[in-house]
Amino acid sequence: MSITVEEKARLIKEYATKEGDTGSPEVQVAVLSSRIATLTEHFKAHKKDNHSRRGLLMMVAQRRKLLDYLKKKDEGRYTALIARLGLRR
């Protein structure tokens, strides 16, 4: 249901803007997107799991806030990230 330590480390390494970067919006959005995809698969089998669905909605909202922040600060980085992750908008 959650992502593994190795998967998270791979995402951090792939989306980091510099060495040791774990807090940039790009990294945070990539990790959230991976967790959202995992939970989406979970809901295909467990349709009535409303407790976890609330967590999913909170993650989607957090990702949206981070993307809005990135768009406001640097639209070029925003469009590049959207393209790399394959997100709509």
Swiss-Prot record:
Gene it is expressed from: rpsO
DNA-binding in keyword set: no
Protein source organism: Cereibacter sphaeroides (strain ATCC 17023 / DSM 158 / JCM 6121 / CCUG 31486 / LMG 2827 / NBRC 12203 / NCIMB 8253 / ATH 2.4.1.)
Keywords recorded for this protein, A-Z: Ribonucleoprotein, Ribosomal protein, RNA-binding, rRNA-binding
Function summary: One of the primary rRNA binding proteins, it binds directly to 16S rRNA where it helps nucleate assembly of the platform of the 30S subunit by binding and bridging several RNA helices of the 16S rRNA. Forms an intersubunit bridge (bridge B4) with the 23S rRNA of the 50S subunit in the ribosome.
Superkingdom of origin organism: Bacteria
Assigned GO CC terms: cytosolic small ribosomal subunit
Coiled coil: none
Subunit architecture: Part of the 30S ribosomal subunit. Forms a bridge to the 50S subunit in the 70S ribosome, contacting the 23S rRNA.
Transmembrane segments: none
Alphabetized Pfam families for the sequence: Ribosomal_S15 (PF00312)
Protein name, per record: Small ribosomal subunit protein uS15
Example of a GO biological process term: translation
Single Gene Ontology MF annotation: structural constituent of ribosome
Family: Belongs to the universal ribosomal protein uS15 family.
Keyword Transmembrane helix: no
